[in-house]
Structures are given as C-alpha cells and as structure tokens.
UniProtKB/Swiss-Prot annotation:
Identification of the protein by name: Hydroxyethylthiazole kinase
Highest taxon in the source lineage: Bacteria
Enzyme Commission number, as recorded: 2.7.1.50
Residues annotated to bind substrate: 70, 244
Known pathway: Cofactor biosynthesis; thiamine diphosphate biosynthesis; 4-methyl-5-(2-phosphoethyl)-thiazole from 5-(2-hydroxyethyl)-4-methylthiazole: step 1/1
Length: 314
C-alpha cells in the first residue's frame, strides 16, 4: 500500500479554535532556526519507505535542503544510520521479511540513539503490518507522522488510553485514507507522544527533558509533544491529488529531526508543507504542475515565512 495524498489533506478550512502563538514566541524562533540549519548543513536523513512514493520522498527532502538516502536491506539501513542525522520508516508497502527486519532495525536505531520517524501507514490492516507495528511498541520511534485514523489505530494497538469516542473497532483507516477527523485523534496523539517520551527517557542517553512528538495530518494539522497541542491551519486541497504527500512529509520531518528536537521538527515540516502548498496553488493548473510547483516552493519558501505561519494552541 502507498500513503496516498488524502492522508495529508492540509486544506484551509477556516479552523479558528485555539490561541494564536505570539509573533515573538521562542517556538517561532526555533522553527526559523531549524529551517535555516537544514539549508545550511544539508543533513542526511535515511528513509525506509514505500516503493510507490520513494521518488517524491527523496525529492522533497532535497528540496527542503537536506540530503536523502533510500535503503531497504537491513544491513544497509543499520550502516547508513550510523552516519545519518535521523531516519524514517514507512510501512506502506511490505515484503514478508520485513516482519522480522523492521523491528530489528528499530531496536538498533534506539540502541544507537538515532532519532527516527514512523509513518504507520494503514495501521490496523493486515497481519504482517499489525505484527510490525505492535513490535515497535518495545522499540518506539522519536516521532510519529500519520493521519487521524492511523494515529487512533496505533494508539489502540499499543493499549494506550486514547479517549476515543465510540467503539475503537470502528476507527480503522480505509486503506491508506483517513476516515476520522483530526480532532477525534487528539487523545490518541497525546497518549502516543507521552508514551514515546517516557520510553526514550528510560533508555536514551539524550537530554531527558527532550519530548517526543506526534504529527497528525488533516484539514488543520495537529502536532503535540504530549503536553501542548498545536493546530496548524493552511495548505492546499490539491495535496489530496498527488500520491506521496504524506509519505514525503514524513521524510522531511526526519530531515528536520536531524537538526532539531522532535517538536520543532514536527512543527517545521508541517508548516513548510502548508506554506509550500499555498504557494504552489497560485501557479499550478492541475496535479502535475502542482507537484512541480510544490517542490519548487519547498526550495524557495523562506525560514521567516515558515515561522510566521498560523500556529494555534488548542
């Protein structure tokens, strides 16, 4: 399965709930600094991602200013991880040997204290995918990037208190599409972020005060470190018309994770995507030209423009 564009809608909808983050907030300074650092240092982020969208993932990482490495063999992944600033695992398309290989890779990344982003594409569908995602609970990522249904499914799979309304069995992604809105995934996202932070505090040699993050893509994206919930209105409806928008966002999040803390990385990547989508909307005439314009916008949008984007505290 591929992570299709509709798992990252990013459509401007007039979402207004929440308190605006002040213009002089340190959060905005951190975001601008992350965007600049990526462009100045071109950090390497390794991706283990779906065959369907691998090209867009790599090109988006390059357009954002980073360096891309795409790996599939476990030994390649581990060796490359030693020199990469961060890593990205996407479970969109699977082969039988991944059932053992991916959990082993996750364990090695954590042993090496290498930050990594998980995109749990189509969480809850298929025994192999479910087994892999369940195994990740014991070797969790530093950040999760997903749509609302995937976040809810993963939190339920890990037995976390998600505060999900209704029968949890009803909250399943329709393939790689989200059948839940972002708001309904708030409890699951917070629970996941708290769990990731607790686990990494126990086992990582990094600063124990650093919190992990979860980014939920949708009409008004949600990003949380388990303590504060941010909403990010904006983007373009055309993002739903190109496959790989969500997958590539995960890759770019890993690029930012190579130079910043998880919350800053998640906010920076999501805001960059919203801004680039809005810019591409003004010059494109359909999905093909939008994708080209979008990559150009990832390259041209300034750090100041990203940091000045609308950010609301829920």
């Amino acid at each position: 399965m591929s992570n299709s564009a509709s798992s990252f809608t990013g459509v401007s909808s007039g979402y207004t709930a929440g308190t605006p983050v002040p213009a002089d907030s340190p959060i905005r300074d951190n975001i601008a600094d992350a965007v600049r650092r990526v462009r100045e240092t071109t950090p390497l982020a390794q991706s283990f991602t779906t065959f369907v969208t691998i090209n867009l993932v790599a090109n988006a990482q390059l357009a954002a200013g980073g360096t891309a490495a795409m790996s599939f063999l476990p030994d390649d992944v581990i060796e490359t991880a030693k020199i990469a600033g961060a890593n990205y695992i996407n479970v969109g398309t699977l082969l039988p040997f991944y059932k053992d290989a991916l959990p082993e890779i996750a364990q090695r990344l954590n042993y090496l204290d290498k930050p990594w982003v998980l995109d749990p594409v189509a969480a809850g569908i298929g025994r192999t995918r479910t087994a892999i995602l369940q195994a990740f609970k014991a070797a969790p990522p530093t950040m999760i990037r997903a749509n609302a249904s995937e976040v809810i499914a993963l939190a339920n799979m890990w037995g976390l208190n998600t505060e999900t309304v209704g029968d949890a069995s009803e909250h399943r992604p329709a393939g790689v599409e989200s059948v839940d809105d972002v708001e309904s995934a708030t409890g699951a996202a917070v629970a996941l972020a708290q769990y990731l932070t607790e686990q990494h505090a126990k086992h990582s040699s990094h600063d124990a005060s650093t919190r992990c993050a979860v980014a939920v893509s949708g009409i008004a994206d949600l990003v949380t470190d388990g303590e504060t919930v941010y909403r990010l209105p904006g983007g373009s409806a055309m993002m739903t018309k190109i496959t790989g928008a969500g997958c590539s966002l995960g890759g770019v999040a890993a690029t930012y994770l190579a130079v910043s803390d998880p919350l800053t990385a998640a906010l920076s990547a999501s805001l960059l995507y919203n801004r680039a989508g809005e810019v591409a909307d003004t010059t494109s005439h359909g999905p093909g030209s939008f994708q080209v314009a979008f990559l150009d916008a990832l390259w041209n949008v300034t750090a100041e423009q990203v940091a000045e984007s609308e950010i609301l505290v829920q």
